[in-house]
Amino acid sequence: MEKQKSAAYLDESNVRGYLVKPPGGPAPLVVVFMEIWGVNDHMRVVGEKLAGLGFAAFVLDFYDGALFAPPDIQGAAAKFKAVGDEGVMDAFGRAVGFFKARKDVAADRLGVMGFCNGGRLAFLAATRYPHDIGATISFYGGGIDNPKDMLGRTSILGNVPRLQAPLLLCYGAQDTSIGPDEHARVAESLSRANKRYTMSVFPDVGHAFMDKAGPAEARATETGWRMTKNFFTANLVKGHA
């Protein structure tokens, strides 16, 4: 019988989130920073997809189980503001320490990824924990450098010199919330700091294309997951990294 992946919501040692492990031995760990809505069905699917690609995935729940859904952006924004960047980074640090003490995942080969607000948080984590993180993926990371940010988030481009891990940034060309001017500022900061990064802009799609229906979104999602697999394999899997 084919072995199945294991999936469960973890609430232990002040660490909370959705943990999915592929069958077999300890796999490289990817911590997923959720969108502003919480650990919803889409974020759980992301974790399961990563496990299907051979990675252990932990969707970090820094809302302590609270969930929001469109159109309640105000409620979600208020929740995130109450936690803040520091609260999220503290939760991430606890999770890293927790998993490094376990034998069922390979937390010494750690990647991070995030979507929307989570994409910014993945970028931030890579600059706060540069010695722990081996690869970072940010899908349409909003607020990395937006002077008119609706959540009051400050630019994190000043942290770029601390970045050590390879970085993959993915954006939708039709995303009105993250325009080409922001892409350019992010790229310029990374290039000036001599950092290793790849920026990919997907045509014909807007924000949150990895969670939307439509032919263009389907093509972009397929490509996005292929890039995710290749990027994490190249940087986290023994024999490739």
Task: Name each model-derived stretch.
Residues 1-241:
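N-terminal cap/leader regions of alpha/beta-hydrolase-fold enzymes
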